[in-house]
């Protein structure tokens, strides 16, 4: 295989153009993205701090929430700082290795979040359908195994993306009309057939579809259990415990769904719309998740208020 310094096979760097078609608006677009990114950083760091310092929150649900915050921090930080560098300082250049690394982390964190949402749905299923056995089922050992699955499955699925890109010649093509590196965009620059890349990408998407089916199945069982509860107050309490997770799922899958649909079937939609949707997908859910849990989860809300009151 040619070396990574062979500019005919691998370009020494890629140029990320940002959002072609909205070049003159880059500086204005950057400010809302910067604000949302800061909200994501502060919100998720706050969630992690509260869960770490408050012993009463050392429970399965909050361990999974801490994992969600770490994933959201990773997903947003792997994309937005580079985007802001492009918009503010015209730092379009990214090394070939750096581009592959960014691609790996974007797909890794995205995949981890889909698996974690399945795990969180299972957590709510056990909490509502088997409340008396909750602590017996979700032991520390079980939580460790589930966390390993969240990381391990996506490590296995995402690593081949790197080698699928490394096998392709680029013939000097290095202009990426995007704000970050992702598998489909890089493969599209190659001057060789990418059928294997496409097939593998569809296979990975099929895993995500299975995740969605598992989540939906969990909530069908949860709803059946909730409607069998004896009183309306108990049913409302059960719905409330699932509300945060449902909101998080909607925040994650809704922009992903629209991004996928416009990419697959929106050939007449301007390219900058595709890029804007792709960028919203990596920053809006990480910003909204801590807000949702901070507002809807009583234990989190009380501890945040307690911390700020004590500081005052």
Swiss-Prot record:
For molecular function, the Gene Ontology terms on record are:
G protein-coupled receptor activity; olfactory receptor activity
Q: Name one GO cellular component term.
A: plasma membrane
Provide the protein's localization: Cell membrane
Q: Which residues are reported to be glycosylated?
A: 5
Q: How does it sit in the membrane?
A: Multi-pass membrane protein
Keyword Cell membrane attached: yes
Which Pfam family is one of those matched by this entry? Answer: 7tm_4
Residue ranges in the Extracellular topological domain are: 1-27, 78-101, 163-198, 260-274
| Side of membrane Cytoplasmic, spans | 49-56, 123-141, 219-238, 296-312
User: Could you list the residue ranges that cross the membrane?
Assistant: 28-48, 57-77, 102-122, 142-162, 199-218, 239-259, 275-295
Which PROSITE patterns does the record associate with it?
G_PROTEIN_RECEP_F1_1, G_PROTEIN_RECEP_F1_2
Q: Which cysteines are joined by disulfide bonds?
A: 99-191
Q: What is its main location?
A: membrane
**Keywords assigned:** Cell membrane, Disulfide bond, G-protein coupled receptor, Glycoprotein, Membrane, Olfaction, Receptor, Sensory transduction, Transducer, Transmembrane, Transmembrane helix
Record bears the keyword Plastid: no
Name the CDD domains on file. 7tmA_OR52E-like
- What is the similarity comment for this entry? Belongs to the G-protein coupled receptor 1 family.
Summarize the protein's role.
Odorant receptor.
Protein's name according to its UniProt entry: Olfactory receptor 52E4
Q: Which organism is this protein's natural source?
A: Homo sapiens (Human)
Q: Which gene encodes it?
A: OR52E4
